[in-house]
Amino acid sequence: MVYSYTEKKRIRKDFGKRPQVLDVPYLLSIQLDSFQKFIEQDPEGQYGLEAAFRSVFPIQSYSGNSELQYVSYRLGEPVFDVKECQIRGVTYSAPLRVKLRLVIYEREAPEGTVKDIKEQEVYMGEIPLMTENGTFVINGTERVIVSQLHRSPGVFFDSDKGKTHSSGKVLYNARIIPYRGSWLDFEFDPKDNLFVRIDRRRKLPATIILRALDFTTEQILDLFFDKVIFEIRDNKLQMELVPERLRGETASFDIEANGKVYVEKGRRITARHIRQLEKDDVTLIEVPVEYIVGKVAAKDYIDESTGELICAANMELSLDLLAKLSQSGYKRIDTLFTNDLDHGPYMSETLRVDPTNDRLSALVEIYRMMRPGEPPTREAAENLFENLFFSEDRYDLSAVGRMKFNRSLMRDEIEGSGILSKNDIIEVMKKLIDIRNGKGEVDDIDHLGNRRIRSVGEMAENQFRVGLVRVERAVKERLSLGDLDMLMPQDMINAKPISAAVKEFFGSSQLSQFMDQNNPLSEITHKRRISALGPGGLTRERAGFEVRDVHPTHYGRVCPIETPEGPNIGLINSLSVYAQTNEYGFLETPYRRVRDGIVTDEIHYLSAIEEGNFVIAQANSNLDDEGRFVEDLVTCRSKGESSLFSRDQVDYMDVSTQQVVSVGASLIPFLEHDDANRALMGANMQRQAVPTLRADKPLVGTGMERAVAVDSGVTSVAKRGGMVQYVDASRIVIKVNEDEMFPGEAGIDIYNLTKYTRSNQNTCISQMPCVSLGEPIERGDVLADGPSTDLGELALGQNMRVAFMPWNGYNFEDSILVSERVVQEDRFTSIHIQELACVSRDTKLGPEEITADIPNVGEAALSKLDESGIVYIGAEVKGGDILVGKVTPKGETQLTPEEKLLRAIFGEKASDVKDSSLRVPNSVSGTVIDVQVFTRDGVEKDKRALEIEEMQLKQAKKDLTEELQILEAGLFARIHDVLVAGGVEAEKLEKLPRDRWLELGLADEAKQNQLEQLAEQYDELKAEFEKKLEAKRRKITQGDDLAPGVLKIVKVYLAVKRQIQPGDKMAGRHGNKGVISKINPIEDMPYDENGTPVDIVLNPLGVPSRMNIGQILETHLGMAAKGIGDKINAMLKQQQEVAKLREFIQRAYDLGDNTRQQVDLNTFSDDEVLRLAENLKKGLPVATPVFDGAKEREIKGLLELGGIPTSGQITLYDGRTGERFERQVTVGYMYMLKLNHLVDDKMHARSTGSYSLVTQQPLGGKAQFGGQRFGEMEVWALEAYGAAYTLQEMLTVKSDDVNGRTKMYKNIVDGSHQMEPGMPESFNVLLKEIRSLGINIELEDE
């Protein structure tokens, strides 16, 4: 394998055995691709904005004399870039401009004569844009739109599994779900009649909808039933025989023909009888007259002479009717074929309960059901029914819906109309009846072929369409209002409804969520999340077990492990590593094609529906060198079941062992040895890890770390290869390789790094360069590490030396004992940044003022403020300190106009202001690292604001000037090359000032042209620089667009350094979580024979019952990795020659099966080997991919090479007594995370505070400054102790006895410690509740 210069710095030893057939795809593509589809111009008009516009336009006036047509749209440039939007608190969006054409037709002239056409570009609101990392900046905060898993449109056949009716009878139903429009349900009731519901309203007999579609009773019976034809000959009744229909019945008479008796009366008719009848070609048999009684007529029979109806269709025949028919001369009688087994009389029975008899009455019935209480007219009823399922404006199945609909009904074509046809409805009813008759299966709702993904783009498009439809109504009104000659398209369109709809979606939809930004993994997982909740989805309360459960079709599409614990379990899922959505929005996963028993590298993506038809081998099936299966029988999946298949039957094979799990779960090493419940916790807790001060790569990883770090976007990645020309803390400059340059550009890439910014979770985002001057860079190399990344690999925690042993009860019940060394070395120290804002408003009594002149505040409190009343940067502040001084006018009295005038003239003001300064919250302390002042346009800026502005201008100018100098240097280097190549001597050229170089002329015309081009570029560069500087200046100096009534906003950023302390929560990656119980002095920690103490002591009892053995294997492998690092470190210290070093490192990389990774250190230069050794001396990082990890023998081999006992256990000594422990202890390196549940944020105490309104009890929770609840069980405890007085004060004065507590306060102030308990308020609440039930209850004085 070829490594780039940057990759050679540290190579992770890979224990994977299976070849990597497919690279991990870009992890954010589900978000980016979907949004790209939304805003991209689509000439077909299938997707995105284009589709929305085409579906609503053209809009015609009611009279048809004019229409507004859509031509095209374009998105403008955003005003501010992403970072500016975050600082200013605005939305990162672009203006949408649409070209519309207003066409006015002549009134009197023939159809379509155009009188006037006006075209104009109209502004239609702002569309929020996605940042390159798949997020949206809405009002300054980063948000993510989570994809939704919802029921696919189409038709679904289902049953209630016998739960509805008490008899336990299974009732079947069918439901046609459109993408938008009314739902249509068909269902059987316990009496086997078929009913229909529209939009889940009350049910009507299903035949009503057929009547409304203009079918007569005869036609309905004809559609759903086969006929049995009776003939009357010579006063005998004969029946046309279809032998197959008799199977399974008991003969009620002798079946005979041509004098031969085939079946005797009372015998059951079997397949043998039927074969005989067919063989003898029997078509007519004589039946007794009684046999026809109870049969149902299939059509109307009318007496032709009189015209009266003898027998209507769907009437039961009787002997009287038979006689009448015979008299009227009917020789053939058509009846319906039904039996109890597989041809039930359902539709015939339904017709009997149907109150309607023609189209109009059916339409009226439907109208009454949809609009109860409104008087139906024929026209209204027809319109309503027409609009329900047959109007493209009101109903749309969508392409997906039509495809699913046609597939479900076994049709060949998959495209078709978005509205329903008569045929569609009839075929659905036929299929439902077939299922009731026992032919066909019901659908599985939880099958991923019946649930599809709705991503950002699609949801945004739907919202946009909603806005457009609102506009459409207004436009129709305006087009009809008359004087169109004066109007332009702009006057028709009001952009407000559109921007309101879009804004509402991005700002407050259930699926638009505040991004989880704890660390890079939590960002990526949040963007790859799939929720079944949200508009049009499920609700937590209604979702049962089945929906939440893991389904066989989840394999390779949705992770079976990563889902939240609690009420949302199984409703919120995570996309698997390789999964993607297809054009219809169904999830698909890649497989390798198997042809003639040979596994090829050809990759096919299969959706859940397609997968059902194939036999798919697992990724860990053994293959020989040619790609054939080694074993005869291979474990495969087919139709949702796993079993053994012969190798010739296999169609596909999994791509990778980790294709089952999500990104979060794929980062857990030895996942295959963990119980699933604990793995779930492990995957979820990695997302809560707080970035530490110095990131430390995991010694034991899975090989996914790099992909996550790079794709998350927290690192800075090289867009093009080149050479590092300049690097400092805030920018990296790359001189681009010649072959990657665009013709005629300077060939310089500048990367500006983010420093100390606040994340959504108040953690710190800061980038640090990880390349040095002069290093060669390739495209895709990591240039700078972000939070929680180390040399381009995800690094959520720290490698800690752990021992599994009890230690004096300090690790009872999952507590964790930590060494003081961990605190000294700042291993788990993290920086948290808080933003506090002070808003100065314009009140009725006058403006609030930000000032250092605050009434009744001492000098000491103002010592950290400048003259404008704003805290200095660098000030260390603690709870209660003033950050921004602010006074608010106090209104004792509303002043009369005369007084106002006098006040204005003599300006006495100080008397009536109150202090409303921004103070540091009680539990917070830290350092002020930044202050931002935003001033409304037209309000005078204070001194501090001007200082900040000047500083920003200086910084911007410096940045741009440096950028210009760098680009100029690059350009002049190229000009120099051209001139020298054109024959100018280099020495002379050096003496000439650079500005004069461009005046030189060259004889070679091509070179001269090149020179002129470069000169042009130089001028362009300078002009561009001036333009950029001017734009920057304008942005910085202009006033800010603040909310109405706000004059100024001051934002203060505090940085807090949090060391680890008892009460903080820590965890490993295997769901092994605990709370720190004690920080122990180093000298008291257990130590080994070399005197090395351990960092953390964990309880061994936490392992067996939880079955997460992965942590033990990780510990052993970590120990081995560290052992090898120690050996390399010793060799470096002894300054051994490079050859020995190279040989030892090569041995480490060659150890094990190594089928996937080959590292050849002979291709490395000595410097590269030394740099690799420097990076490996803290431990050799290893990767054990999920389900394909290191084997026991490999771990033992590595332990041996590192000079560690292969048992992984060593003798430890007690740090306090120096005695050795009698048994050997498992010691090794485990990757530990500090989770974002810090004791600092949870510590809380209350003195006097606020009370709840009704119960008068103290509120609960830290945010409300609440008290501790003394609950039911605590009361029992005091009762058990017999502590009556303590209990009394708990239940009265300390809680909700209002008079008692005020009295007590007075007493304490007066110095007497008396208490008089009274009536608790909650008792009064109880009395009132009892009275509200109508029971009078009174307290009587004794």
From Swiss-Prot:
Enzyme class, spelled out: transferase
Keyword Repressor in annotation: no
Alphabetic keyword roster: DNA-directed RNA polymerase, Nucleotidyltransferase, Transcription, Transferase
Reaction(s) this enzyme catalyzes, per UniProt: RNA(n) + a ribonucleoside 5'-triphosphate = RNA(n+1) + diphosphate
GO biological process: DNA-templated transcription
E.C. numbers: 2.7.7.6
GO cellular component, as recorded: DNA-directed RNA polymerase complex
Pfam families: RNA_pol_Rpb2_1, RNA_pol_Rpb2_2, RNA_pol_Rpb2_3, RNA_pol_Rpb2_45, RNA_pol_Rpb2_6, RNA_pol_Rpb2_7
InterPro entries given in the database record: DNA-dir_RNA_pol_bsu_ext_1_sf, DNA-dir_RNA_pol_bsu_external_1, DNA-dir_RNA_pol_su2, DNA-dir_RNAP_su2_dom, DNA-dir_RNAP_su2_hyb_sf, RNA_pol_bsu_bac, RNA_pol_bsu_CS, RNA_pol_bsu_protrusion
Keyword Repressor recorded: no
Molecular function GO labels: DNA binding; DNA-directed RNA polymerase activity; ribonucleoside binding
Subunit structure: The RNAP catalytic core consists of 2 alpha, 1 beta, 1 beta' and 1 omega subunit. When a sigma factor is associated with the core the holoenzyme is formed, which can initiate transcription.
PANTHER family hit by this protein: DNA-DIRECTED RNA POLYMERASE I SUBUNIT 2
Family membership: Belongs to the RNA polymerase beta chain family.
HAMAP family in the cross-refs: RNApol_bact_RpoB
Function: DNA-dependent RNA polymerase catalyzes the transcription of DNA into RNA using the four ribonucleoside triphosphates as substrates.
Protein's recorded name: DNA-directed RNA polymerase subunit beta
Annotated source species: Edwardsiella ictaluri (strain 93-146)
Gene name of the record: rpoB
